[in-house]
Amino acid sequence: YEIRLSLVGSEMCIRDRPWAAYLLSALPFFTLALASYYKVQLRGDPVLATDLRLIRTAGGIMGNYTFEISAPVIVVLEGFVLMLVLSCLMLRKERMSPRSRLAGIMLMLSVTLACYFELYTSSSIYKETANNDLISPWSAVEVYISRGTTYPFLHSVQDMFPEPPEGYRESEAKQILEQYADTDIPDDQKITVVGIMLEAFSDLSDFPQLNEISAVRNLYEPLHELESRSVSGNLLTNIFAGGTTNTEWGFLTGYSQHEEFRGPINSYVRYFKDQGYDALYRHPGYSWFYNRSNVNEYLGFDECVFNESGFGDLISIEDALFKSDTVLVDYLLNDIDSRTEDDDSLFLFSVSYQNHGPYSSETYWEEYVTPAKTGWSMESCCVINNYLAGIRSTIEQMRRLTRELEARDEPIVLVLFGDHKPWMGNGSSVYAEMGVDLDVSTQEGFYNYFSTPYLIYANKAAKESLGQDFRGDGGDISPCFLMDKLFFECGWTGDGFMQLQRETRAVTPLMHEDGYRMVDGSITLDVPPDVAEICRRYLCAQYYREQHFVSES
């Protein structure tokens, strides 16, 4: 309220018009409230200050969603208009001298700045405003909403700027990393590495409600067969129903937490390049989405192909939502086959676009669930059927890819993983109707909310070249540990940071942004002191590596 009153006062001093002061002061907060409301409905998380960096990305996908004008929105709209009318009719226009006007503006600015830096950024005050008796303290969304919209948004502004982990000392972090020497990939083991992050890829047969349906079990059976011939497990992501680059960049950098990168960054892409690899990136979507065109350059990729620079000639962006995996697999195979013996080794990474939400709730093209069989609404059944139809196609194409790789004499290892659970209705309505537990304070709810599949597959030539079996349970890990897991299965040591990761992963394979760790197989926020110290050292070393770019290893 202090900030809002200061803005109103400033506008009064500038314009002498109460209605204009109200309108220009209320409109930003009204817009923020609506944006946060709909983001929670569509994505399951509120608007934070860091989202301002992604306004263009958000604008590009808004047309895909349906914005329901609900009763709360109508009430807020009516209140906004009513207050504007009252300010026009009941508040008098006051003339002010230039000196009074300037003094008023300076006073309001002083109040605004004082309130922000003394109150809104205070962690202690923020903790004191907790409403844990009324909400689930483990739900970041409920914690945010319980404080309104303006206050938590302004409090999040400081998160736009990097803040070191608790107990961070640069000299200590540097010393931690210096304990590990970078190790090269042996020349005779520099095989082709292919990585594919699959859009909203999730094994919904993990839910008993769907696993008891034979059509759903049959759909996922080819995936399970492929997993049985690979190293496989669950990826415990930081995100739900969106925010795909969190998982993507976690894999490519090894960082357990990160924002959008703004300059050259140490990454595993650069490690591959230092080892003499060519690093290529492929995505059938737009390059501006999540600012990938710039970020991929910061990560160190040699070449990137997006919709605008290649895929658009093969498939329209509209069709890419439904059937671009076939095109993507063909493109990747061509990348592999066009190499010659004189070319460098290849790191080929791609992000799929097929099956990006939302999914239609009005009609469907393939039938897996029906209201008659499940008791669920037709709208929910449509969403589920349309999602599963896309998954069926994706699984078919990934199996085709593995067959093609197996037929080649070139040694190739492939890592597949999902970025996040799929969108399933505004406010996760479809999950709720199915009875899926999304309470992350429980082990079951945490997995239901955050887990996606991953697998590491190698063709016969790669198994022979590396002397590894590439089969078995890979365990459940955070995205930041997936590249390390890939290197471990290949028998490679990796750089110094990866070696630190491997030691940390042995203690807790989960490094979640919200502080969750996995200790002796249990997910917990109550971390034993010895594990907490290992995590602190890891986070400090990670922060140091992120902040100190080294162009060449």
Language model feature labels by segment:
Residues 25-190, 213-231, 262-269, 392, ...:
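N-terminal secretory/membrane-targeting segments
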Residues 6, 75-79, 351-352, 484:
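Extended, compositionally biased low-complexity polar/Lys-Gly-rich tracts
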Residues 1-9, 14:
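Single conserved hydrophobic/aromatic residue that forms the stacking wall/gate
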Residues 17-25:
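Membrane-interfacial loop-to-transmembrane alpha-helix junctions, especially the N-terminal start
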Residues 178-188, 195-198, 203-553:
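Solvent-exposed soluble domains appended to multi-pass membrane proteins
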